[in-house]
């Protein structure tokens, strides 16, 4: 998974897609760390926070641009966000 797929220019680092890719990369690193260090509770808390931030960004992207959202989910191989029940 590379960031260059989603970056058109160097100034585009604030885009939603780039932020989601960046969070996904950090989540993968932290998941591998937690496989070795199971009792690292501070890292577990950080992982939950990152998952929440990525989830909020994904739901925002799905409301703004559904085609970009679907492409991003397929390329990153992550599950689709749960839809609001209300």
From Swiss-Prot:
The record's SMART domains line, in alphabetical order, gives:
Ribosomal_S15 (SM01387)
* Classification via Pfam families: Ribosomal_S15
Q: Which domain of life is it from?
A: Eukaryota
Its GO CC terms?
A: plastid; ribonucleoprotein complex; ribosome
Q: Which SUPFAM superfamilies match?
A: S15/NS1 RNA-binding domain
Where this protein primarily resides, as one coarse class? plastid
Query: Would the keyword Ribonucleoprotein turn up in this protein's UniProt record?
Result: yes
Tell me where it resides. Plastid
Entry keywords, A to Z = Plastid, Ribonucleoprotein, Ribosomal protein
List the Gene Ontology MF annotations in alphabetical order.
structural constituent of ribosome
The answer on whether this UniProt entry bears the keyword Kinase reads: no
GO annotation terms (biological process): translation
User: Which family is this sequence assigned to?
Assistant: Belongs to the universal ribosomal protein uS15 family.
Q: How does it assemble?
A: Part of the 30S ribosomal subunit.
Q: Which HAMAP family match?
A: Ribosomal_uS15_B (MF_01343_B)
The molecule here is called Small ribosomal subunit protein uS15c
């Amino acid at each position: 998974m590379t960031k260059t797929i989603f970056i058109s220019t160097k100034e585009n680092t604030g885009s939603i897609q780039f932020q989601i890719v960046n969070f996904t990369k950090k989540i993968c690193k932290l998941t591998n760390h937690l496989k070795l260090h199971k009792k690292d509770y501070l890292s577990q808390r950080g992982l939950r926070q990152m998952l929440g931030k990525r989830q909020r960004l994904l739901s925002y992207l799905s409301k703004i641009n559904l085609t970009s959202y679907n492409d991003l989910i397929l390329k990153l191989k992550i599950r689709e966000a749960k839809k609001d029940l209300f």
